[in-house]
Regions:
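Sec/Tat-exported extracytoplasmic proteins
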Residues: 70-77, 133-134, 138-142, 156-164, ...
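Surface-exposed intrinsically disordered loops and tails
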Residues: 94-100, 180-191, 267-270
């Protein structure tokens, strides 16, 4: 999320080794230690060996979890992605996941080399960060770099990890800043907490109305980078796009505790997605 989720039981993984040929990472320039390739063969995991055993554990856990994440991501978008490589290291110098994640593009060609921040002792956060970038690859060049796509990628990460990144929440800041309208307009950046937060709260609201990410994600990709959340609302509900913001605002105002998380309507993880 620099361009800024539970793990299965432990499994036997390949012994780490230095890769002969490594991907071109967005920013990492150190040694890439190969940990292995997932059983399905779609995800190859590397680690920065200088971080020692805690980072290696993160990488091994990600390797064990990778196929589950890919399968969940494919189900959300209704498509199958391509092979990706991912490296676990201290992105931004952090080892608690707060360094986020990054990749160079929003498809499986330009964005298939993914960086994720190590999170010592909390490998579910590493899986969440991986899904945040993987979901952007599944957007196929649409939405990525926009407030709409950033909100969608964060919701995907939350769904596959049971909200392992609550400290990345932006909806409370959006509420504190006066709830600017990013439903009728899309912000052409993924770095604005207000526009991302508006999107997080809006998607929470849509899901509280019964729409799942498996419906929302393909609909957003179809609308594309020039689309708005109001258009998404219209396409899903068959109501007028002009009613999206007023209806959303009414729902926000009716919240008994206000906006205190990225999921103010309490939709939580969805088994259907």
């Amino acid at each position: 999320m620099n361009h800024p989720l539970k793990l299965p039981g432990s499994q036997t993984v390949a012994q780490p080794r230095i890769a002969a040929v490594t991907p071109q990472w967005p920013s990492y320039t150190g040694t890439s230690q190969l940990v292995g390739t997932s059983p399905v063969g779609q995800v190859t995991v590397y680690v920065d060996p200088s971080l020692g055993a805690p980072a290696l554990q993160n990488a091994q856990d990600l390797l064990n979890d990778a196929d589950r994440v890919v399968s969940a991501n494919n189900a959300i978008f209704g498509t199958s992605g391509g092979p990706v490589s991912v490296i676990v290291f201290a992105l931004g110098g952090a080892t608690d996941g707060t360094g986020g994640a990054d990749h160079l593009g929003c498809d499986y060609t330009t964005g298939n080399a993914i960086e994720v921040c190590a999170s010592f002792g909390s490998s579910n956060r590493v899986s969440a960060l991986f899904e945040a970038e993987l979901s952007e690859c599944s957007m196929g060049g649409n939405l990525c770099g926009q407030s709409t796509g950033e909100a969608l990628s964060r919701w995907c990460a939350s769904q596959i990890s049971n909200n392992a990144l609550p400290d990345f929440a932006t909806a409370p800041q959006w509420a504190q800043d006066g709830q600017p309208d990013y439903v009728d307009q899309t912000d052409p950046t993924d770095q604005n907490a207000d526009s991302t937060g508006c999107g997080m709260a809006f998607l929470s609201w849509l899901m509280s109305k019964g729409y799942t990410l498996t419906q929302i994600a393909p609909a957003m990709v179809a609308i594309g980078s020039g689309g708005t959340f109001a258009q998404l609302y219209a396409n899903l509900t068959s109501d007028s796009a002009s009613n999206a913001w007023p209806a959303f605002q009414s729902a926000i105002q009716a919240l008994p505790n206000g906006v205190t998380s990225d999921d103010p309507f309490g939709t939580g993880p969805q088994s259907g997605s």
